[in-house]
């Protein structure tokens, strides 16, 4: 056995046992700045013999590194790198990792003590990992209120339009002149879902009317799920899943959305429910006709959100024709009214109405009120019933003869909407948009949601609550259209109310279309038929009323019957709705890695492809709005004819045809269809910032609200009405105090200021905890500030002074870092007192422990890869070439162990003395289960398919400071001169880096700029020592084509130049990409290597491994002349400018808050009575403002609007 291995067996260290695999095979070839650190870890794993001291071993290692540093990172390019730094890492997180490792080395000798601690902590880990307990009540109390008019503030004109709509509805509702309108109540109809709408009372009828949202365009849920296949082995595969419109599609990754692996039409789903297994509470099942799909989410909260979203989408699909829902109940059929309480702080009116005279079946309707209107409506209905009886109207059923399935004094049963064994289902109302149809046949869609019976003695017709509606009610507003504000004046005339005929539905008689194909058969390709004809098939054109009309003499146009049949098959293949119209079809090849033979479809909305090869199920759905252009290529293969489709922000799509005429016709038709949709493209994509932000906030807040209702035992999705005149706002009813904890440089603090301003706009109080040097900056934005220790300048100075690892550095690090981290932990604990929610940069190290001690929700936020994934390596261990998923995942494991090894001693001591918590370890902390917000664009950092649901890539948190920067006159003259000479202007700046020869680096940049023939805005900050006050100055005279600008606001400068060269910090990279500038990155340390590779991967710039005259000049020419890079950077800039990172982050905080609360663990929980008291206090605080004054409720009874619908759960 090798000597190293035997020595390792004799004396294993605590650090060694925490590692999963031998790191030497992975990290020795790394060229990142942390490579030396990784080498030291690999070597320190093998403890020397008894005669060899630790100090002598470290001296040998230091000598090894000094000798090897000259050849470190060398390749065939032997040209020097003038930008080589004097120290290993300067990014703050990198410094922390390096310093923590140095400190951790001193603990390697304490084997017995370490073994005891490790054994104790591993025994504790099992109890901490139990996540099956119920989540505590969230800190958010959500209210729903009605804003002013959605178009503008409520005016007399808009009120008159609303009254005209009501009059139009009542006129259609009431065919008899003797029926009069009485009252209107804002309420929610409780069925499978809770639907916001209005209840209208007349002297003879009760109506419920609601506008159903059109989820086709504004509803989009994405995330990763596991699809479980097989019943015995239960194999599962992870996919990126997108719920949009009426389809649920599965993809390989978040960047491969044009090639769905599986598409499910929601109209084919008969039910969706959580599985009843207690061992797997994160699974849910989709029933698709006679099949079922089992999906698994990462958490119970995520699974519940997916089920809720799919249910709402299914309901909306059933009402997609009119986007409205109407129920009509004759008052004389009402047999009982009961006011009850289902949800906290709300009133519920249960109405039992006779359904059928022959069977005396009774239906139950539940109307939920949040303004005390339940009793008012009950009294009004009772009064109207008495009037009807006094006037001689016959009450069809004696109230006393109908047995109530649920007594007034009985306790409401717990709801279980996911029990498939119960047949008391709720059947949705059907809206029929047909002027010729006067009756409604029994429906065929079985409800996805079921209720659990409380007693087997109940009749099938008398469920607990809510019971199954045994008939389908025809829509009373068949063609009520939601148009743009300019069309509201004609909205009243479009309302068409139709009569209906009630009927019974027998569950056993429900059947489906026998001719419809199953999901599996749709994905199964047909065998070749008439292969010779298909090989050189002519195009086929299809005429439609709504699409392009081909001339009558067109030889390729199919007749009407074939067109109809082809349209039906086309919609079935790709799960499109009836609005999709096929324009043309072709046979050809999709050329990705290899040519795939199949059929190409062009519709009025999409370009599609379907493989015809046996065993190949490739499909493509490319929206026309994403297509920029198409053009002919001579050929990709001999004998074939090529067509290239240019996609916005995506690589091109290549098609091949065996027939030249087919290729030319496809190009012609494609351009015609693109021209037809081009006029609508701007309308489809142009949404105001306020509208997008509102939609993001609404979706997240609604998810939070549903979770709070679920905590009370009611798993009920909510649908908020899309009223054309009012918009419903869901927002926290109480201001809470957020603590944002971060340490580091100005670039580390800036995103938190942007997030703080967004949270303040939501009505919350925000405090940023960071270094004192940023106080004035933070306070200038009216944000709270608390100072903590941990300024990285001390560590930076320490690293620069020593340059490489040696015994002096180890001794200084052991002393300075220990004091530094102790001060940081203590001040962070003091600063976090009194906050309700903590968001922390993980480099601050203290947050996860403080949140545990304070028992508050905890989030992490960072700018670089910090969570385990196979898609990206850790930002500090980026290899010189891609090495695959195993290596990437291992880098995260390696870094976590290194990082924790260095700080664990101090942290555990601090936990015991200050926080009064027991010791912990990596397993007990569960830091990979913490909700994580990446403030990076998903274009630069696409979410990996193996990211858990609680990991969100939100987009950049830009801080657009409106400071009036006034450039010097000579600066503007320089820029104007460059434009006059038609010279490209580039920005070059690397921050305050420390290099060996700063003068030589300046000379190299000057020569490279001259060779490239561009003008340069230079921001010099490099020097040969840390903190040099003369770093910004240049001793020599600069040529006329270079201007030393110093620090200039990026949001001002980047709009006036053509390209950038910088070090690759997250903030600078985001600013240059948002401006649409080609970017050259010369990384020096930390996450800069990661962003250099990402910018090059997405085609927006160049990553420089070495900076010298030739390499920089070549890169400058490339980014200023290569049209492909320039166009790609511009496209990425347009996409990033449409992102709303702060709004997305706030939405993620809301949506993941319940999950964050469920992770709060402590080894010594508080007494149950204390918990109950805290919960009671929290509930009482729900209607109290931040100042402690009782919130005044706005009464709107009788107003007929929803501006008083407060929901305080």
Curated annotation (Swiss-Prot):
Q: Where is this region: Disordered?
A: 1186-1209
Q: Which SUPFAM superfamilies match?
A: PH domain-like (SSF50729), UDP-Glycosyltransferase/glycogen phosphorylase (SSF53756)
Q: In which residue ranges is the amino acid composition biased (Low complexity)? A: 1196-1209
Question: Where is the protein situated, by its record's location annotation?
Answer: Cytoplasm; Membrane
Please list the GO biological process terms of this entry.
Answer: carbohydrate metabolic process; lipid glycosylation; sterol biosynthetic process
In what residue span(s) does the PH domain sit? 218-315
Which is a Pfam family this sequence falls into?
Answer: EryCIII-like_C
Q: Which residues cross the membrane?
A: none
Q: Which top-level enzyme class is recorded in the Swiss-Prot or TrEMBL entry? A: transferase
Q: From which domain of life does this come?
A: Eukaryota
User: Where primarily located?
Assistant: cytoplasm
The UniProt catalytic activity note for this protein reads:
a sterol + UDP-alpha-D-glucose = a sterol 3-beta-D-glucoside + UDP + H(+); ergosterol + UDP-alpha-D-glucose = ergosteryl 3-beta-D-glucoside + UDP + H(+)
- Domain GRAM, which positions? 167-217, 568-634
Membrane topology qualifier: Peripheral membrane protein
Disulfide connectivity for this sequence is none
Alphabetized GO MF terms: sterol 3-beta-glucosyltransferase activity
Question: What's an example GO cellular component term for this entry?
Answer: cytoplasm
Which of this chain's residues are annotated to bind UDP-alpha-D-glucose?
745-746, 748, 1019, 1048, 1050, 1063, 1066-1068, 1087-1088
Query: What EC number(s) are associated with this protein in UniProt?
Result: 2.4.1.-, 2.4.1.173
Keywords recorded for this protein, A-Z: Cytoplasm, Glycosyltransferase, Lipid biosynthesis, Lipid metabolism, Membrane, Repeat, Steroid biosynthesis, Steroid metabolism, Sterol biosynthesis, Sterol metabolism, Transferase
Similarity section: Belongs to the glycosyltransferase 28 family.
- What does it do? Sterol glycosyltransferase responsible for the glycosylation of ergosterol to form ergosterol-glucoside.
- PANTHER family with a match to the protein in the record: STEROL 3-BETA-GLUCOSYLTRANSFERASE
Q: What is this protein called?
A: Sterol 3-beta-glucosyltransferase
The gene name reads ATG26
């Amino acid at each position: 056995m090798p000597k190293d291995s035997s020595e390792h067996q004799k004396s294993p260290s605590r650090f060694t046992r925490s590692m999963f695999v031998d790191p030497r095979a992975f990290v020795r070839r790394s060229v990142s700045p942390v490579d030396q650190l990784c080498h030291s870890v690999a070597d320190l794993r093998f403890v020397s013999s008894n005669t060899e001291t630790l100090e002598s071993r470290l001296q040998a290692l230091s000598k090894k590194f000094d000798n090897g540093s000259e050849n470190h990172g060398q390749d065939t390019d032997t040209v020097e790198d003038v930008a080589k730094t004097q120290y290993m890492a300067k990014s703050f997180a990198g410094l922390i990792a390096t310093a923590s490792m140095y400190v951790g080395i001193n603990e390697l000798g304490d084997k017995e003590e370490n073994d005891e601690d490790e054994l104790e902590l591993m025994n504790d880990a099992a109890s901490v990992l139990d996540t099956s307990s119920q989540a505590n009540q969230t800190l958010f109390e959500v209210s729903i209120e009605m804003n002013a008019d959605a178009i503008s503030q409520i005016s007399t004109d808009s009120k008159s339009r609303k009254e005209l709509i009501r009059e139009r509805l009542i006129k259609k509702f009431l065919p008899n002149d003797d029926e009069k309108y009485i009252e209107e109540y804002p309420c929610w109809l409780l069925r499978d879902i809770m639907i916001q709408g209005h209840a209208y009372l007349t002297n003879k009828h009760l109506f419920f009317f609601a506008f159903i949202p059109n989820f086709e365009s504004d509803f989009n849920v994405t995330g990763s799920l596991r699809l479980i296949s097989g019943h015995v082995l239960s194999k599962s595969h992870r996919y990126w899943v997108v719920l949009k419109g009426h389809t649920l599609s599965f993809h390989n990754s978040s960047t491969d959305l044009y090639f769905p692996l599986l598409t499910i039409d929601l109209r084919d789903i008969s039910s969706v429910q959580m599985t009843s297994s207690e061992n797997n509470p994160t699974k849910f099942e989709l029933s698709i006709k006679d099949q079922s799909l089992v999906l698994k989410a990462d958490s119970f909260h995520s699974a519940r959100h997916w089920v809720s979203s799919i249910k709402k989408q299914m309901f909306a699909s059933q009402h997609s024709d009119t986007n409205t829902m109407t129920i009509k109940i004759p008052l004389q059929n009402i047999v009982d009214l009961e006011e009850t309480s289902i949800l906290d702080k709300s009133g519920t009116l249960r109405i039992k109405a006779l359904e059928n005279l022959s069977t005396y079946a009774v239906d139950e309707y539940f109307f939920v009120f949040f303004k005390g209107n339940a009793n008012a409506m009950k009294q009004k209905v009772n009064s109207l019933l008495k009037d009807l009886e006094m006037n001689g109207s016959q009450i069809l059923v004696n109230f006393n003869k109908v047995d109530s399935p649920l007594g007034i004094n009985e306790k409401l049963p717990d709801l279980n909407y996911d029990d498939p064994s119960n047949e008391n289902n709720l059947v949705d109302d059907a809206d029929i948009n047909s002027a010729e149809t006067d009756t409604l046949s029994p429906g065929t869609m079985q409800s996805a949601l079921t209720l659990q019976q409380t007693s087997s003695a109940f009749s099938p017709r008398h469920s607990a609550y809510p019971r199954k509606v045994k008939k389908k009610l025809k829509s009373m507003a068949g063609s009520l259209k939601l148009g743009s504000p300019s069309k509201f004046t004609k909205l009243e005339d479009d309302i068409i109310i139709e009569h209906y005929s009630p009927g019974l539905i027998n569950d056993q008689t429900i059947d489906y279309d026998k001719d419809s194909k199953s999901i599996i058969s749709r994905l199964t390709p047909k065998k070749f038929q008439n292969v010779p004809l298909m090989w050189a098939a002519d195009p086929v054109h299809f005429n439609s009323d709504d699409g392009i009309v081909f001339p009558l003499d067109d030889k390729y146009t199919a007749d009407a019957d074939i067109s109809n049949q082809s349209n039906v098959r086309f919609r079935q293949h790709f799960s499109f709705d009836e609005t999709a119209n096929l324009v043309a079809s072709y046979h050809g090849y999709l050329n990705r890695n290899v040519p795939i033979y199949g059929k190409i479809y062009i519709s009025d909305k999409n370009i599609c492809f379907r493989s015809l090869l046996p065993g190949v199920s490739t499909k493509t759905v490319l929206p026309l709005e994403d297509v920029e252009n198409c053009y002919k290529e001579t050929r990709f293969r001999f004998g074939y004819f090529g067509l290239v489709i240019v996609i916005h922000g995506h690589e091109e799509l290549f098609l091949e045809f065996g027939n030249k005429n087919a290729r030319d016709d496809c190009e012609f038709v494609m351009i015609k269809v693109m021209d037809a949709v081009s006029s609508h493209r701007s309308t489809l994509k142009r949404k105001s910032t306020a509208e997008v932000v509102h939609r993001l906030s609404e979706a997240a807040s609604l998810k939070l609200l549903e979770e709070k209702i679920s905590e009370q035992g009611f798993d009920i999705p909510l649908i908020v009405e899309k009223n054309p005149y009012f918009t419903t706002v869901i927002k926290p009813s109480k201001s809470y105090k957020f603590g944002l904890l971060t340490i580091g440089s100005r670039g580390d603090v800036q995103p938190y200021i942007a997030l703080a301003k967004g949270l303040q706009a939501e009505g919350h109080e925000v405090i940023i905890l960071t270094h004192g040097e940023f106080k004035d900056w933070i306070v200038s934005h009216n944000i709270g500030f608390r100072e903590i220790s941990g300024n990285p300048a001390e560590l930076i100075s320490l690293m620069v002074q020593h340059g490489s690892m040696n015994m002096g550095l180890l001794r200084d690090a052991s002393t300075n870092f220990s004091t530094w981290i102790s001060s940081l932990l203590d001040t962070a604990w003091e600063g976090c007192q009194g906050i309700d929610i903590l968001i922390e940069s993980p480099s601050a190290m203290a947050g996860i422990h403080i949140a545990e001690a304070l028992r508050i929700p905890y989030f992490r936020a960072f700018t670089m890869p910090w969570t385990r994934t196979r898609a990206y390596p850790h930002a500090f261990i980026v290899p010189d070439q891609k090495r695959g998923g195993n290596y990437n995942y291992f880098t995260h494991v390696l870094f976590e162990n290194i990082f924790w090894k260095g700080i664990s001693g101090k942290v555990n001591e601090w936990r015991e003395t200050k926080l009064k918590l027991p010791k912990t370890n990596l397993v007990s902390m569960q830091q990979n289960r913490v909700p994580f917000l990446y403030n990076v664009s998903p274009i630069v950092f696409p979410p990996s398919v193996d990211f858990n649901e609680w990991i969100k890539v939100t987009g950049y948190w830009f801080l657009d400071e409106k400071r009036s920067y006034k450039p010097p006159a000579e600066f503007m003259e320089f820029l104007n001169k460059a434009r006059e000479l038609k010279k490209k202007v580039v920005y070059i700046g690397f921050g305050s880096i420390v290099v060996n020869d700063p003068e030589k680096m300046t000379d190299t940049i000057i020569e490279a700029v001259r060779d490239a023939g561009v003008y340069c805005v230079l921001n010099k900050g490099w020097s040969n020592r840390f903190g040099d006050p003369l770093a910004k100055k240049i001793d020599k005279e600069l040529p006329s084509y270079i201007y030393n600008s110093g620090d200039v606001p990026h949001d001002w400068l980047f709009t006036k130049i053509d390209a950038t060269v910088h070090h690759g910090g997250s903030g600078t990279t985001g600013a240059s990409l948002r401006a649409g500038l080609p970017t050259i990155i010369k990384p020096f340390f930390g996450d800069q290597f990661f962003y250099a590779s990402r910018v090059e991967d997405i085609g927006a710039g160049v990553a420089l491994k070495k900076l010298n005259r030739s390499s920089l000049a070549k890169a400058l020419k490339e980014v200023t002349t290569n049209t492909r890079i320039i166009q790609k950077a511009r496209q990425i800039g347009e996409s990033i400018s449409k992102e709303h990172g702060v709004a997305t982050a706030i939405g993620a905080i809301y949506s993941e808050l319940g999950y964050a609360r469920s992770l709060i663990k402590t080894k010594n929980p508080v007494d149950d009575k204390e918990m109950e008291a805290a919960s009671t206090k929290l509930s009482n605080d729900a209607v109290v403002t931040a100042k402690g004054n009782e919130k005044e409720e706005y009464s709107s009874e009788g107003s007929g609007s929803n501006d008083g619908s407060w929901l305080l759960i």
